[in-house]
UniProtKB/Swiss-Prot annotation:
This is Non-histone chromosomal protein 6. It comes from Cryptococcus neoformans var. neoformans serotype D (strain JEC21 / ATCC MYA-565) (Filobasidiella neoformans). Residues 1-32, 68-116 are annotated as: Disordered. GO terms for biological process: DNA repair. It comes from the Eukaryota. CDD domains: HMG-box_NHP6-like.
Amino acid sequence: MPKVSTKDSKKSTASDAKKRTKKDPNKPKRALSAYMFFVQDYRERIKTENPEATFGDVGKLLGIKWREMNENEKKPYEAKAKADKERADRENADYKAEGKASKKAAKADEESDDDE
């Protein structure tokens, strides 16, 4: 007798993909964390020191190294993260301001069309 599954299995279909909203290519990139700046610097070193390490192993080794670092060693990465956060906030504010301006212009166009 075949086993009957009681769980509803949802598989993504082509119609599901069509329902997703498109991402705006002009949207600013998110700010990187101090850890991500550290990873950018250290990933190649870890890979050369451990050539047999898998992607997951490299990630684990990076995490271990990050946790072993003291505050002074982390400061350059935290400074980069702070600067990147300021950049992201500034770009996001500009992006939102552009969006509001274009929405107001579109609304004004609609209202002028309605008057005619």
